[in-house]
């Protein structure tokens, strides 16, 4: 558009509306929902930062966002689309107009228009869950073999960032006042045992993320909450067991890949709570920590039983959108 929009219309698929309607928008000082997200992006976003588009917002920008939101009409509609992930934004200012459509996954811009002229037009995948990579090669046996044999130099940078970033936001969740403070409540009520710390750290990270904290998170399966749940319990158990860094990396490979393996058939957005998949993944990673020196078949049996047991208990949990209560669901999934 080239200038601030005088009005905006957002069309989104049902799962997008569900997931955004109640969650705080990072950096906005407590605003929530799709209109707030649209206003934040238009008034103060930095598109060069991709998924961290709102990461540089300060107090001055917060005031500008609130002013913009108060005086700019922003409407939200349910998209008439068969896709699970579909967002179309129209914006206008004076005689100028612009349209951008994102489909299938979070960074996939498929259409851009300016004043009716089409600047970008990509085909939309009819099967919205195809994604960028073929995950059909994944299996529990294959994941364990890879975790044991992988050259860690190929994954060390990503896993070290996962440890550093996700631990930082969990610690912030334990320090600050975010949502229902599930992580803090768990530690204060039940003590500092590793079983409590494992779920408290994951819950605290979600406390912060779901309630406006702008710290970055290394995601898994397109989800920050899943990234937190798949990693932080494993990190806590690795500390408790005195595992070295290489062992922690390999356990995180198990957790992350089991989570992705489970989510591959569920889809990026669904009515199935993704914390369940990630909690199951972290359980598999913890089982790896305890059984890493066992023979291959014995380790496979331990991890497989962990997956079956965890899914048998909590797989009925429903996703009703991202919000403060996600932290409690994460604690239940890890438990």
Where are the language model's segments positioned?
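Alpha-helical support elements that line or immediately flank enzyme active sites
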Residues: 1-3, 42, 227-245, 284-293
């Amino acid at each position: 558009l080239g200038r601030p929009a005088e009005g905006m219309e957002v069309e989104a698929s049902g799962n997008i509306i569900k997931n955004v309607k109640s969650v705080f928008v990072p950096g906005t000082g407590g605003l929530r929902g799709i209109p707030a997200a649209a206003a934040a992006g238009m008034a103060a976003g930095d598109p060069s930062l991709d998924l961290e588009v709102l990461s540089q917002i300060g107090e001055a920008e917060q005031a500008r966002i609130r002013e913009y939101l108060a005086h700019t009409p922003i409407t939200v509609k349910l998209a008439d689309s068969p896709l699970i992930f579909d967002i179309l934004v129209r914006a206008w200012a004076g005689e100028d107009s612009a349209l951008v459509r994102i489909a299938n996954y979070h960074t996939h811009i498929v259409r851009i228009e300016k004043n009716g002229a089409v600047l970008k037009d990509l085909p939309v995948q009819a099967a919205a869950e195809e994604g960028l990579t073929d995950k059909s090669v994944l299996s529990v046996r294959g994941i364990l073999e890879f975790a044991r044999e992988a050259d860690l130099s190929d994954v060390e940078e990503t896993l070290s960032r996962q440890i550093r970033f996700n631990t930082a936001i969990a610690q912030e969740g334990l320090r600050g006042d975010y949502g229902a403070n599930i992580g803090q409540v768990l530690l204060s009520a039940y003590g500092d045992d590793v079983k409590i710390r494992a779920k408290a750290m994951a819950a605290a990270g979600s406390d912060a993320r779901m309630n406006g904290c702008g710290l970055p998170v290394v995601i898994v399966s397109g989800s920050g909450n899943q990234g937190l749940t798949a990693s932080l319990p494993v990190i806590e158990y690795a500390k408790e067991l005195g595992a070295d860094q290489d062992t922690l990396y390999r356990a995180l490979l198990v957790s992350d890949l089991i989570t992705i393996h489970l989510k591959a058939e569920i889809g990026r957005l669904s009515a199935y709570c993704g914390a369940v998949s990630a909690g199951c993944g972290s359980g598999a990673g913890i089982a790896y920590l305890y059984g890493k020196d066992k023979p291959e078949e014995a380790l496979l049996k331990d991890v497989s039983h962990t997956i079956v047991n965890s899914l048998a208990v909590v797989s009925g949990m429903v996703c009703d959108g991202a919000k403060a209560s996600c932290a409690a669901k994460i604690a239940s999934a890890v438990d």
